[in-house]
């Protein structure tokens, strides 16, 4: 059995490779020296990845995402692997957990995240559990219109 990418998949690879070489790799040295990605660079990369059709490529097309399947999204990830994770994480796409949005959650969370107006965060790591989700102790409890978080988190991705 011979395996080959379709023309569309080859175009996905070429677009992502070109984006990575032009928009990400040139900033690697600066980001590594700073130890962070400056906010202006985050904004620039996000805007350009949206324009290139790469941002939210894993989200449903019916809500403005790219509609790529898991395999095609992996092709995008493979090309991003040529650069610093700190840089390609900016365009690493919204979390797949957003696919579970229903009803009002779609307009409140999913669509604004797909368009780049909102950022999804991941707060998984804890002092006594690391990133073992079964060992997590932190809880979030609804209190009126607010949420009360009880516990401690580390390494909250996109929390800035």
Locations of regions flagged by a protein language model:
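Glycine-rich flavin
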Residues: 25-160
